[in-house]
Regions:
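Glycine-rich phosphate-binding loop of ATP-dependent small-molecule kinases
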Residues: 1-215
Length: 215
């Protein structure tokens, strides 16, 4: 399947994407991952992106799209892909549309994960992340706590609350999402690609998405 996953921070895009990749071998693609991988590989595009990232600047859309094109042409994308958290803005959505037309790929659906704000706040304020950059296992102090001493089961490093997952920071991230990304819902509705899913259970959501794509 070839889909875009939309949803506010904490809507569960990553968890749902994982369930879907296990279903049909589609690969999960996020801009953060492809930028980091391009930098690590030392490609010309990666070197260019590294400059922006080291200065703490946003990587321009044109450069992101060039790196995205390289990624989508890789063999593992032939089975399908799940774009997790991209596009984020209307200009990015328009650029993605042009890119897909250029490389002859059609999206099956754009999935909007509609999760209430109070659920998102609860999920993210209770989330803890392993502080080891090579591990970064995700925990939740309610549903999947780390060890009793607050360390990671996998590597033993402290599991900490990220600075952008305090209540104040989350509210700011949600406000940014509503301003910049929510307009994509109307964009993809007009493209006749939008499927809105309201369930909170990741397996149930994955099942609904699979049914929608098969129609």
């Amino acid at each position: 399947m070839r889909i875009v996953l939309l949803g506010a921070p904490g809507a569960g895009k990553g968890t749902v994407a994982k369930s879907l990749t296990e279903f049909d071998g589609s690969v999960q693609i996020s801009t953060g991952d492809i930028l980091r991988n391009a930098v690590k590989a030392g490609s010309e595009l990666g070197k260019e992106a590294k400059g922006y990232m080291e200065r703490g600047e946003l990587v321009p859309d044109k450069l992101i799209m060039d790196i995205m094109e390289v990624r989508m042409k890789e063999p593992d994308c032939q089975k399908g892909f799940l774009l997790d958290g991209f596009p984020r803005t209307i200009p990015q959505a328009e650029a993605l549309k042009k890119l897909l037309e250029k490389i002859g790929i059609k999206l099956d659906a754009v999935i909007n994960l509609d999760v209430p704000t109070d659920v998102i706040l609860d999920r993210l304020t209770t989330r803890r992340t392993c502080s080891n950059p090579d591990c970064q296992e995700i925990y939740n102090i309610k549903s999947k706590p780390p060890k009793p001493d607050g360390t990671c089961f996998k590597c033993g490093s402290p599991a900490v609350q990220r600075a952008d997952e305090t209540e104040e920071a989350i509210k700011q991230r949600l406000a940014t999402y509503n301003e910049k990304t929510a307009p994509l819902i109307d964009f993809y509705k007009k493209e006749d690609l939008l499927v809105t899913v309201k369930s909170l259970d990741s397996k149930e959501i994955a099942s609904e998405i699979i049914k929608a794509v098969k129609k």
